[in-house]
A protein has these predicted regions:
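Short glycine-rich, Thr/Ser-proximal phosphate-binding strand/loop in the N-terminal lobe
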Residues: 2-47, 80-83
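Short glycine-aspartate micro-motif
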Residues: 3-7, 62-67
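Feature marks short, surface-exposed loop/turn motifs that line or immediately flank catalytic pockets
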Residues: 34, 72-74
Length: 125
């Protein structure tokens, strides 16, 4: 079983895959390109996630869940970013959209899932 952690920031998006022991197997990042509706950011996140998964040598079906750490306020139960001052998101159903683009069935917006997906060091490139 593997976990995907995503660090969504105003300047960059980082993603990494770890195993059940919390060992980071592969990580990568891309620049956050801001657009008015935010869909470009979600598409870039999806591309980065799929790249990291492929580069790890696993498939989307091997991912137990993905966790997103995001600035601002989020409704974890609905998978929605309510507001993010540095990003163009307002009541954005990011988990559903990212799931649609990647095929990852379980995506949470909550730091505890990001941490469980283990990303000690993900932000320190």
């Amino acid at each position: 079983m593997y976990y995907l952690g995503i660090d969504l920031g105003g300047m960059s998006i980082k993603a990494g895959v770890c195993n059940e022991d919390g060992v980071i197997l592969h990580k990568d990042s891309c620049v956050t390109v801001r657009e008015e509706d935010g869909d470009r950011i979600i598409r870039d996140m999806a591309s980065l996630c799929l790249k990291v998964i492929a580069d790890t040598g696993i498939t989307v079906d091997d991912i137990a869940y993905a966790g997103i750490a995001s600035p601002g306020s989020a409704d974890s139960e609905r998978g929605v970013i309510i507001y993010a001052a540095t990003l163009p998101f307002l009541n954005c159903p990011i988990a559903a959209r990212l799931s649609e683009l990647t095929g990852i069935k379980k995506i949470y917006i909550d730091d505890k899932y990001f941490i469980k997906g283990s990303f000690n060091g993900l932000c320190r490139k």
